[in-house]
């Protein structure tokens, strides 16, 4: 028999040392990290230090080189756990026991290293004592562990504050629990949505996990675009035409190649009519995601095909109507369904006379210069519109219920931009019948253990390992904030990542939900036969307490229900929600500190600093008057006499004299009236209302005198057209007829 020599892979593979965890080595046999004890590290340090301090003579170095290589011995010890464990044990015996004999020292691997540092056994004990004294005086070779987790939380928060990039915050959320905990508040701080689909996902997630709304401080919905934007598609079509003429010399594309692209897209029936063939999904696609009437059913099984003879007839008719190769291949597949269960026969003859025709592969060109790699397409992909909802492709409306959810669940908003927003009619479900529709809620689009996973990530303690990246960590997709937007759909490549956002609602349950509530199949309780089920009232109460406690028709995957359970919501409910969450608060002022005999009430403003309600055709003067009256705070004149409210130089004397309305007024209180509305708030009503150039449809800056003056006129219903204002000035200039006659 041939005898094979064992290969020493240590001569080819260097000892692995990790920069993250230097106290561990990598074993190439077991493919695992093995920690090094402090005794092993001290032993290696002594060997290296003694080699540098006492260089032997040339004869000894030559003699040692004949025996073995010191560097190779050290590398072998770093890669062999048995040698390190034995050397550390023997090192402890040497330090604690009396000096052994030379023969016993040479019999162990530790003795071999120490024997090279000295020639006699007495010198070994001296070297050990000397090395112990030196290690106490010198700094350790491997200092204490330095990691970002050892920094205070305030410093870590300031570091993440300086990042100021949404994509970087998203990458930090994929790193570890500590980074997820620190980056999450900054990631949701400023949100800018461009897709109604992403905003619908965000609102549903707010109802599932309301704590996320505490982080939001700015929301911008003014950039919402439809799924099919004609201007953008025309620009992209012109760019593609120019690029095609430059690359292909003005030649046309292969029709077979176009057929291949259409066959890959399940919604190719009407997509090919649009330029570039790309229509993004809207909020209705998220609403009817689990509704079987709006979803694409999978292909039927082979047993059903074999039992149903009509299917082959239908397929044969469809094959006669189409002449493409893809349709003919599908008909051949369904003509003989049991062909796949038989063993395949070899058709190639062994005589060698027949020659197989080899098809030439399709040539493809790599576009390395463009930012369109497969990874980016997978991560930044936006779902396309359903073919049953193509007539909504040019609409960019949002239901009123989503806006109300956002306002109620985000109490810390500082900037709210709803400019150019188109609203669609929505209905609120009566509270007495909400529990009947909880199985059809869009909350079921997310897994039931979503809150548990998020809470587990956000719960940091000493047991958590911040170094590891758990594969089961909840990974959100792209959130379209700014250019990236809000993506709540998982786009991971692994199957575990895809399962996380898989709907828990079965096909049978969704099918029954379309017809009636009473036919809904009861869930099968596995392994819970010994435990009593929870009462229905407990489940109903927990469902009613989710989110803001309100459910709208847009929150269900049903198109319509009984109108007796519905209540129509008007657009003015948005103004009422803003007032309830961010309106002024009336509190009693503590008068004991200022020795005031009677209690005083003071208005406290909310957190809002900017509201954009421009281009809202449903707004009118009465709604604006009511909105400003309940939103704006006033400086109490009763506190001025006690010196509690400070008085600023709100406007210059020139500005005050230039205003004719307040200049000609004899009442000093009327002249100073706009000052009481001064606050850090900007409200934009530009181009709102049914008509153009309305006197109240302007930008109101309450930090300026003009803004406070306009707000005062709106509240007091004192708005006039320019002609009426000119007539009023002329009357004041002339005065009364009797007064001029007597003068």
UniProtKB/Swiss-Prot annotation:
What the entry lists under InterPro entries is as follows: F-box-like_dom_sf (IPR036047)
Q: What ranges does the record list as Acidic residues composition bias?
A: 229-248
Q: Where is this region: Disordered?
A: 224-257, 311-330
Q: Does the keyword Calcium apply?
A: no
Q: Which domain of life is it from?
A: Eukaryota
Signal peptide range: none
Alphabetically sorted, this entry's keywords are: Ubl conjugation pathway
Which parts of the sequence belong to the F-box domain? Answer: 145-191
> What role does it play?
F-box protein probably involved in ubiquitin conjugation pathway.
The molecule here is called: F-box protein COS111
> Which organism is the protein's source?
Candida albicans (strain SC5314 / ATCC MYA-2876)
Source organism phylogeny: Eukaryota, Fungi, Dikarya, Ascomycota, Saccharomycotina
Annotated gene: COS111
